[in-house]
């Protein structure tokens, strides 16, 4: 994200463009089995926020997207190696179709929204997460992981 943004920044500034950073719901919630992935996606949130502050005076907007699981071949391949606890936690956010996420991104850009959390379930979980300072996410994930482990 940093390299691509750096390569295109002059053109984006000239056209008063819009930068879209694709992160993940894992950046917000963290996930069992996704320590490195969640960390890298959380870094994208910080990158997007910093970029927003730097580019706003130049007329450039930034949107960061944090979707749950999206129906792509990558997720089918990953499911073959994911531990039961990871599968159980991932299922909490729902499963979105790529065209729905794309439409949501286009809408967010048109509305100049900074943060996009696609999917009703994920938005509700995000609101609860913020309202409870993450407690509800930890309690829910702990219960889901415990249940997944008891089945195996």
Where are the regions that the model predicts?
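Residue(s) in the substrate-gating loop at a strand-loop-helix junction
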Residues: 24
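Catalytic tyrosine of NAD(P)H-dependent dehydrogenase/reductases that use a Tyr as the general acid/base
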Residues: 37, 45
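Alpha-helical segment proximal to the catalytic Tyr-Lys
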Residues: 10, 53-57
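Active-site loop immediately N-terminal to the catalytic Tyr-X3-Lys motif
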Residues: 31-35
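Active-site helix of classical SDR
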Residues: 5, 40
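Conserved catalytic-site region of short-chain dehydrogenase/reductase
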Residues: 11, 27-29
